[in-house]
């Protein structure tokens, strides 16, 4: 499991003084990119080779709101499922370790614009999958 801590900035909150729903996707995207970089995956280097990892579906369940200045953590796990990479991202408010949001992101791989069977995921994330088997 990978985790990334962050803090809610006031401008991310709406009139009810809770984090606007769209910002949770920003948090998850940022954590996903940091996670992949920690595994040595460079989106720009892959793109230059004609390989693109693309989000095909995102599901978000809002459990408890985050508020301005809350410290939180995005926790990530992933697995292969057919041609897709499934990335599970849960956001926890660190004040009491309370689940705020559950997310699941499906990622596909394109090779020069063509959908692949996801073989690249096995290559890119072999160490992660071996360690977390």
Place the predicted regions along the sequence by residue.
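Hot-dog-fold acyl-thioester-processing enzymes
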Residues: 1-54, 110-133
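HotDog/MaoC-like acyl-thioester-processing domains
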Residues: 3, 67-68, 79-133
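Hydrophobic beta-strand-centered segment that forms part of the acyl-chain substrate-binding groove
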Residues: 35-73, 77-85, 102, 106
């Amino acid at each position: 499991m990978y985790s990334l801590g962050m803090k809610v900035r006031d401008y991310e909150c709406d009139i009810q003084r809770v984090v606007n729903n769209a910002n949770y996707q920003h948090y998850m995207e940022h954590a996903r990119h940091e996670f992949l970089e920690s595994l040595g995956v460079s989106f720009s280097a892959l793109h230059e080779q004609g390989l693109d990892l693309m989000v095909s579906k995102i599901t978000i369940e809002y459990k408890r709101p985050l508020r301005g200045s809350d410290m939180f953590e995005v926790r990530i796990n992933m697995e292969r499922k057919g041609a897709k990479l499934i990335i599970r991202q849960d956001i926890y408010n660190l004040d009491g370790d309370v689940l705020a949001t559950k997310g699941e992101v499906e990622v596909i791989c394109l090779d020069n614009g063509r959908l692949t069977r996801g073989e690249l995921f096995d290559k890119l994330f072999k160490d992660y999958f071996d360690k977390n088997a």
